[in-house]
Regions:
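Alpha-helical scaffold segments that flank or form the walls of functional sites
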Residues: 26, 52-53, 70-141
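C-terminal cap of metal-dependent C-N hydrolases
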Residues: 316, 326-369
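Divalent metal-coordination and catalytic microenvironments
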Residues: 9, 25, 32, 50, ...
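Active-site gating loops and adjacent loop-to-helix segments of metal-dependent hydrolytic enzymes
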Residues: 67-102, 192, 202-217, 240, ...
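Short, well-structured alpha-helical segments that form the helix of a local strand-helix-strand
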Residues: 104, 300-314, 324, 328
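Active-site core of metal-dependent hydrolases
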Residues: 151-157, 161-276
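N-terminal metal-binding scaffold of metallo-dependent hydrolase/deaminase domains
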Residues: 1-42, 320
Length: 369
């Protein structure tokens, strides 16, 4: 077994993100897994003592193709910009049709550069859109691009074809399909991710979209929930919810009840949503989430829960072998230690300051000699 050892100033370890200082990590080059985590520094270890290691982040909801045409329609409401093939987004898909794959790829590479190693992507444009996503992420090492496709015009034959190329289905809203179509999607994608936007706007919430989704589509992943109430959260304790607070603020659709969701035991994940209006930086997303939760419940501190939502919780939902513990894939993100080591609360510091402290990310495929 060929292995390397690294010495770290600190790290967030295991499922509970336990913070431990002055450790060494040994990893198997061939298997790309962590084989041992020890206390103190190893005399043969590569010197990374000026860094704190955190596990890779997961961006659990994006529309990456939008990144091709940033800041279009800043004077237009959400309903005019996204959604069905008559929206501004689709008009720009046509204008930039030869640039979409490049735009997606840039989004993914920029994400990886700040320690986000999995991006869950709602891909529009049907089967063609999923194929563009596959093409865009080809060759990006140590990276997961989870593609949730959808059909702009429903066809059971195309639905089955989509099933063969996508990781799951990304439903724009309950109003996108008829009840029989929702049931067909559920049946065809019975063993894959079934994601759906829910109650992003007050209009959809007042139409009882959550109840209808649960009844007919039976989602395995919900997106936004901006206008859900505390009582609604009790209905979705078994369904992970991805919140995108920066997007909700930009589109003026409301502010997600983050503190209530955490206290009600909802499995919270985090996403950056539309790349045209919100950048790929998930670190900003979790910082905003923390600030919102504290405004909703003064003097609260949900930093650790929020950081878990961008890491550990997402690993479980998407079945990722990530995390800094033995037998997990060797994939870590390095943050500059100097500012963090003085922090009186390491989790709050990482959530609020991590965006500026990411130095680089390490995988077993890299040569650390």
């Amino acid at each position: 077994m060929e292995s390397y050892k690294i010495n770290l100033g600190g790290a967030l370890l295991g499922e509970d993100l336990e913070y431990r200082e002055e450790i060494n990590i040994e990893y198997d080059i061939e298997k790309e897994t962590i084989t041992h985590i020890g206390k103190g520094f190893d005399k043969d270890g590569i010197d990374l003592r000026n860094f704190i290691a955190v596990p890779p982040l997961v961006n659990s909801h994006t529309h990456t193709a939008d990144f091709t045409f940033p800041e279009i329609g800043v004077d237009k409401p959400l309903k005019d910009l996204v959604g069905d093939p008559k929206s501004e987004k689709y008009r720009y898909f046509e204008i930039y049709q030869n640039k979409i794959s490049e735009g997606i790829r840039n989004f993914l590479i920029n994400s990886k550069n700040i320690g986000v190693f999995t991006v869950v992507d709602f891909r529009e444009q049907g089967i063609k859109g999923v194929k563009l996503g596959i093409e865009a992420s080809s060759g990006i090492r140590d990276f997961n691009h989870i593609l949730l496709g959808r059909l702009d015009t429903f066809s059971i034959d195309e639905l089955r074809e989509l099933y063969n190329s996508a990781h799951g289905y990304g439903l724009p809203s309950i109003s996108s399909n008829s009840i029989p179509e929702l049931i067909d999607i559920r049946r065809v994608f019975s063993d894959k991710i079934r994601a759906a936007h829910v109650s992003e706007t007050k209009k959809h919430y007042l139409r009882h979209d959550l109840e209808q989704l649960i009844s007919y589509y039976k989602p395995t992943l919900l997106i936004h929930g901006t206008n859900l109430s505390k009582n609604d959260f009790s209905l979705i304790r078994e369904i992970p919810l991805v919140i995108c607070p920066r997007s909700n603020l930009w589109f003026s659709v409301g502010i997600p009840k983050i503190a209530d969701a955490i206290e009600e035991g909802v499995e919270l994940l985090f996403g950056t949503d539309n790349g045209a209006w919100i950048d790929y930086n998930l670190w900003k997303e979790i910082e905003v989430a923390l600030l919102i939760s504290r405004s909703q419940k003064p003097l609260s501190n949900f930093a650790k829960q929020i950081l878990k939502g961008a890491t550990i919780t997402a690993y479980k939902v998407f079945k990722l072998n990530y995390g800094i513990e033995e037998s997990r894939k060797f994939l870590i993100v390095l943050l500059k230690k100097e500012e963090l080591v003085r922090a009186h609360d390491i989790y709050t510091a990482i959530v609020k300051r991590g965006s500026n402290l990411v130095t680089y990310s390490l995988g077993a495929t890299q040569n650390l000699k």
